[in-house]
Amino acid sequence: ENQAMGAPLVLRYRLEALPMAYIIIEPGGTVGYVGDARLIPRKKPELACAYALAGKYLGMRLVYLEAGSGADSPVPASMVALTKKLLGDVLIIVGGGIRSGRAAAELVAAGADLIVTGTAVEKSQDVASFISELTSSIRR
């Protein structure tokens, strides 16, 4: 329903539609609650991969593995690695629960092409230092 309501706006403003599978991993946070999502259990990476693969077969070029804003911990690196291995050229985005350069580096090493941080940046006492820590940790 929301996609149908938004589609005319995408057309009117000539926005590029990004075909993305949005997969919410437990705990899911607010996005899981508001979206009334069926959360993927953290210990079931094969289930996340099945959904991601379905997205690829439906023409989606991006997969977003989302633990939810302010999650206690990020999406497991093992889930990211398995998803990237299975999907290959599909861009993998990982967000939620990323609070350190080390966590970001683990996810990028596992196969994340992009990481998303929000709450951690918003709550940081020194935003510039935090962003510097993240970017220096993930440079390839």
Regions found by a protein language model. Name each.
Residues 67-70, 97-98, 110-130:
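Glycine-rich phosphate-binding active-site loops on the catalytic face of alpha/beta enzymes
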Residues 4-18, 73-100, 131-140:
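Alpha-helix-loop-beta-strand connector modules within alpha/beta enzyme cores
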Residues 19-25, 63-65, 92-96, 115-117:
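Hydrophobic faces of well-ordered beta-strands that scaffold small-molecule active sites
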Residues 29-39, 63, 74, 78-84:
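Active-site/ligand-binding-proximal alpha/beta "capping" segment
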Residues 1-58:
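Conserved anion-binding
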Residues 55, 107, 115:
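Conserved, mostly hydrophobic/aromatic
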Residues 53, 81, 105-106:
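Alpha-helical segments flanking ligand/cofactor-binding loops in enzyme cores
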Residues 1, 42, 63-73, 118:
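Catalytic beta/alpha-barrel core
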